């Protein structure tokens, strides 16, 4: 599968664009919930623009023996979730909407704690058929960019950031097909 690289500058600009759309909407979050680990940095950048506190959840597709699982499961959840989430407007953040199963899982878990409202923000929404479904309770979905179905390489996953950024530069030099 072809790769698509994003730099920290790309991520920052995309998160800023999302924050502007959140502010222009009728949704005003009380808290940001980051899905770890990909949603941590986007959530932190959104906090800069929205000024809201961040909570984090951990979700995995691997069992205790590092074997892949069909569906996601919780590895870390919000301490005192009922107290922190009930009646709140939550902005759920992840880096990419690929299969949508992680988003669906987290939304359903959050709904158990009776929030006033949940909105979703993702940096990138892959243009492909999704396995998961966003529950109808979610009225706002903010995607920074809609991208083709390629392997996305984020800077926080790079072991050599200069090599990563060079790959991004090379991709931008290739004419669009």
Predicted regions and their residues:
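Short glycine-rich phosphate-binding loop at a beta-alpha junction
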Residues: 27-36
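A structural signal for isolated positions on well-ordered beta-strands in alpha/beta enzyme cores
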Residues: 31, 55, 91, 119-121
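PRPP-dependent phosphoribosyltransferase catalytic core
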Residues: 2, 108-177
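Short, glycine/charge-rich flexible loops or terminal/linker lids adjacent to PRPP-binding catalytic cores
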Residues: 52-90, 100-105
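Short, structured coil segments at secondary-structure junctions
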Residues: 49-50, 137
């Amino acid at each position: 599968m072809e790769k698509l690289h994003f730099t920290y500058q790309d991520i920052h600009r995309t998160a800023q664009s999302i924050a502007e759309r959140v502010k222009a909407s009728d949704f005003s979050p009380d808290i940001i919930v980051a899905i770890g680990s990909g949603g941590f940095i986007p959530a932190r950048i959104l906090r800069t623009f929205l000024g809201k506190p961040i909570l984090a959840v951990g979700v995995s597709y691997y069992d205790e023996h590092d074997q892949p699982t069909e569906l996601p499961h919780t590895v870390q959840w919000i301490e005192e979730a009922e107290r922190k989430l009930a009646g709140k407007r939550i902005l759920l953040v992840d880096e990419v909407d690929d299969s949508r199963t992680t988003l669906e899982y987290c939304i359903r878990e959050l709904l158990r704690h009776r929030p006033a409202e949940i909105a979703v923000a993702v940096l990138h929404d892959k243009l492909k058929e999704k396995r998961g479904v966003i529950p109808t309770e979610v009225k706002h979905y903010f995607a920074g960019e809609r991208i083709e179905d390629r392997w996305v390489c984020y800077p926080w996953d790079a072991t050599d950031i200069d090599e990563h950024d060079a790959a991004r530069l090379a991709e931008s030099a290739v004419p669009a097909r």
